[in-house]
Amino acid sequence: MRLFSLIILWNFSLWFLAMNCAAEVQLTSPLQTVSAIPSHPGQNRFSILVWPYKTDILRDFELYRKLGIRGFQIDRGAGQEKKVEFSIKQNIPYYVGHAADKGFLHLTRNNRKAVTNQHGLVIRPHSLADPRTLAKMKDHLRRNVTATKKGRVLAYAFDDEISLGRMTNPCDVDIHPLSLQWFRKWLEKEYSSIERLNLQWETLYDGFDTVMPQSFEQVRKNTKKPLSRWNLSRWMDFRHFMDFQFAAVLSELVLYTNTLAPGIPAGFVGGQGPGPWGGYDYAMLCRAVQWMEAYDIHGTNEILRSWWNADRRLRMQTFFSSKNPKLDSWFLWYYMVHGNQAVIAWPEDWFHTGGGDIAPHILANKQTFKEIQGEISKYIVNPKTLSDPDPIGIYYSHPSIQAGWAMDAIVHGKTWIKRTGTLDNENQTMGVLRKVWCKTLEDLGFQYDFVSYLDVEEAKVNLNKRFRVIILPKTVCLSNKEADALREFVEKGGVLIADYLCGILDEHGKGRSQGVLDDLFGVVREESAGYMNGKGLTEIDGEKYKKPYLQRFTYYKNARRYKEIVVFERGTRDSRGANTLMENTLKKGRAVYLNLSPLEYWNHVRRFSIYGHEWRKIISDILSSSGLQPRVRVYENGNSPNMIETLWWKHNDKQYLCIVKNPTEKKELAKLGDAIEGITGQTVNILMKFPNPVELTNLRTMKQLGKGRDFHDHFNPWEANVYWVKDKTFQ
């Protein structure tokens, strides 16, 4: 009887806490966007913020000054009042880390083990659906924010490398009773009736109160079927919900922090790459927080730039020294001209090592540290300076990332649980493909923005107003709403490019007999012919992760190639019988189905060989026929392409051009082939050719290069050049 009473009391307590939590955390979609917070008035230059690893601002400040470093980190905050006072006295900025403490958003010790190597559904330690978890984090925030908010705080970070589980390692959390309750409520809003859910899931539930998700272990057994017969809905819906839960809790923590310290952005550091695990749906995360330091995995830096451009939310990178001064210099310049406002320096072996106060490889970049935090950075870091991309969109479909991961995991069988985030970072087909599309456009002299699938689904973006061309990278999952929006984009004059496997699954991961946009592209599929060499579906084989990149494509052997590029769908044809570069017109626009996989472009040898030339020509021809031309072409010692990226920024009526080296693999190489200087190479002469006459000034040297279309200058591959471009045609 006593046990029964305790169970009743426990359930009542959970219910009471859940009802109070419901008043704070958003429970159903669509996820609302937290308001942006303008940059700190003093944050108009790039900053290097030193993490306190084997160093301390109070002890080593003179060493920081010697290097020209102007920022630091306060860990947690409570009890760190001396550092706050020091910040005020020296007028030096800091960010606060672990403000919500460690162990809740980033699981530690035994709690981490509980979410590692699990095949089934798992209860997350410190469930984010449990109001007690939220209350504990808020208590830490209250103490840490109160102790630190009077100084020059740039931002508050809840924790580092946060995750639903452990980084982006696979684990199907969270079936805590309150999480399941929340999931069922969310499903009811998504599906509106149990009949619709049963039809989608192919189940026979009587009501939402008994609905259960499936783990990947349960659904993976069905991935051997033809794609048209796949149904990942019970797993993908659960993963989508957990991404929503993660973002909703972060959003609530942001709003709470804003009540404690209005005017200071709140977010997190150590962001992982997009994937089905850990809570890393960037379309949601970008709505949930006001700033982020995300590792640049699978294009996160450009994703954040795209969606945070209008309000210039704070973005940072972590700076790990390579101990090669040229590589370190390049890193700082690269991320500054890509719009990051700061880096967090991990100072291992920086200070008090090898018998000296400052390590030689760090001291070697003393002038770089000073310059990059000086006047030159104000042109880019100024919150009113905005990225100015070309009207090209790259589609971000998180359901496709989930389904793509399932395709990658086929080769692992039961050992999929050991596909760690580290392994996935190097072998995730969707992630590498995203980077390939970025590098392709950059090599052709273009910039772009990512398109959020949520914005399209919720009709929050006018596609034709923003884009002339939209690219769908292996967008295997599309909802009917998304398909309708993309169809309308074409009808109104847009150009839509899909590489392969477009729209074969719906947004929940359920197969269709034909792709939802097959009629738009004018293609017909014969699925029984298979893919690549006809023997598999996985592209980058994670079982071969120890082998060189180009040796991991198991099913490319004997696959058909078009101009050296692998043809993916063996049985897809258009009305003319063509199997590649299939094009269809609809009203004012057109749709192009490539049926090609350019993943090998990520290899630097392929990129700058005949393979890369042929791939770039295919894309260049489509863009050119769509009315797009690069705003400048840069030649290095007479060569183009040359691994030089051009970036455009605008500040009211002023236009800035940045150029920087843009590697994929092997960043340390001094030379690529016979003609292209690597980051660690030598100073080169460059020629910049503009289509229209402009007036050009090098803002680093303040040298006026005159007026005209062609300009010569010097370029150090381990740095960046920044120019002011006066162009009468600029609007």
What would you call each of these model-derived segments?
Residues 27, 49-50, 54, 94-138, ...:
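Extended substrate-binding grooves/exosites of carbohydrate-active enzymes
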